[in-house]
């Protein structure tokens, strides 16, 4: 008799995706982040669901309802901080996942890669709208500044911004619709993640060597299920350390001040995971130019596969490209730091140089170095 997991229509899908899936025998811990992102997403949906049961999306009561969750709801404080810091863990995993893709040439699966870019945009949109919901000072002013960027679009910009706001400023209508979008988007992300997996399973996973591994596959279960569980334990450990010891470490103290349209905070800045893009936005003195650079800072990932000039897939055997990759990582860390600094000398210049370097590495230096490496192979 055939095993039910191989015959039942629903169980068969799960079986072919997580149990009998043929996987390369040499994938490292860098391949753990897909499953960790799945765990992050489910954790965010669950904690978010329980928060939504007590939250009110009204300007008069939003701030108080979050305080009420932390003070009066059973274990409300831990749910709230798990949700807030869960977002940070989500983005840490996202950045490492994308970095892995860049390093090992996983972008050579164009469908999987492009769905991944759409997923990144969707998660960023979700996080931005979630940050507005507590209706603190940084929530309000962050929403005002970021939505205002759309006014840089020629001709329709101003009308578009007022349409998104539902009025002439960020107000009650804006908060209500942001809550609605923040609730629905994670489910869209979930569906996109399923499509992401679907495309990945069409080709199979890449591996650190970048060499096809069809001749050397092992079943996903038990080898990679146990490895994923270990990764999940580390993720939960890191999250709970953050939640229980320093829950406000990554947040902004200004968000504990209720939103006040009459009082602008001295430094308006987004959450840490958007700072690199915010620094790129601020480094261009022109509004439309800044907005385009901001969008392109993520969209540039879509061009990476087209600029792959190397004869090898990954960077495992390409020391020059490796140096360039780690320079890119250092540059992104620099941009993140600059994004949190005030707009004054020397930060302006550092930000501009780091922004130029970011695009130069991805669009010019990487393809050029790859061609040099190809020629070095002939010697």
UniProtKB/Swiss-Prot annotation:
Keywords: Electron transport, Heme, Iron, Membrane, Metal-binding, Mitochondrion, Mitochondrion inner membrane, Respiratory chain, Transmembrane, Transmembrane helix, Transport, Ubiquinone
Binding, a ubiquinone: 201
PROSITE patterns, per the entry: CYTB_CTER, CYTB_NTER
Membrane spanning residue stretches: 33-53, 77-98, 113-133, 178-198, 226-246, 288-308, 320-340, 347-367
Subcellular location: Mitochondrion inner membrane
Sequence positions that bind heme b b562: 83, 182
Residue positions binding heme b b566: 97, 196
Quaternary organization: The cytochrome bc1 complex contains 11 subunits: 3 respiratory subunits (MT-CYB, CYC1 and UQCRFS1), 2 core proteins (UQCRC1 and UQCRC2) and 6 low-molecular weight proteins (UQCRH/QCR6, UQCRB/QCR7, UQCRQ/QCR8, UQCR10/QCR9, UQCR11/QCR10 and a cleavage product of UQCRFS1). This cytochrome bc1 complex then forms a dimer.
Anything else known: Heme 1 (or BL or b562) is low-potential and absorbs at about 562 nm, and heme 2 (or BH or b566) is high-potential and absorbs at about 566 nm.
Free-text function comment from the UniProt entry: Component of the ubiquinol-cytochrome c reductase complex (complex III or cytochrome b-c1 complex) that is part of the mitochondrial respiratory chain. The b-c1 complex mediates electron transfer from ubiquinol to cytochrome c. Contributes to the generation of a proton gradient across the mitochondrial membrane that is then used for ATP synthesis.
PANTHER family, per database record: CYTOCHROME B (PTHR19271:SF16)
Family membership noted in the UniProt record: Belongs to the cytochrome b family.
Protein name, entry field: Cytochrome b
